[in-house]
Amino acid sequence: MRKITEQNLINAFGGESQAYMRYVHFSNQAQNEKLNNVARLFRAIAHAEYVHAGDHFQELKYLNGGFVANSMTVFGPGDSEKNLKLAIAGETYEIEEMYPTYIEVAKFQKENGAQRSFEWSYATEKMHKMLYEKALESVNSGKDVDLGPIQVCEVCGYTLEGETPDICPICGAMKDEFTTFK
């Protein structure tokens, strides 16, 4: 694999791994505030970030040794309102800056596996941002967000509210490849 795409995969793995941990902590905070659906949303999206990290990791399975992952992260956790704003900022960075650049570099370098991994994550992060914005609107009005079941594809991390699709619109995985967060 070409070095720039390889480093982008390492960085994306680091960023998605950090997002997973951050969202687990944010979920715990929401639970403490009795915002059960916000907590469930953070848990579901944390799981999707875990899937993204795993996809990037699999593209790097040939590596052996220690590597530095340079990735954007957000700090300063607080109440659920602040945590949702931090989550939206992180997702926005991935949508507007990180993944579009990584996709173009992988495409230019003809690294098809990396490109696919980046494209799957990019498509999913847009849904994460929309779900977090919906939750923030509810929290800002003093109530928990109204959410149905949240589905996460175990292959690409695609996340949606509602019924499980027969086929994942991102990666083509079948219905039984989804995990439901109720």
Where are these regions (language model features)?
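Non-heme di-metal
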Residues: 1-182
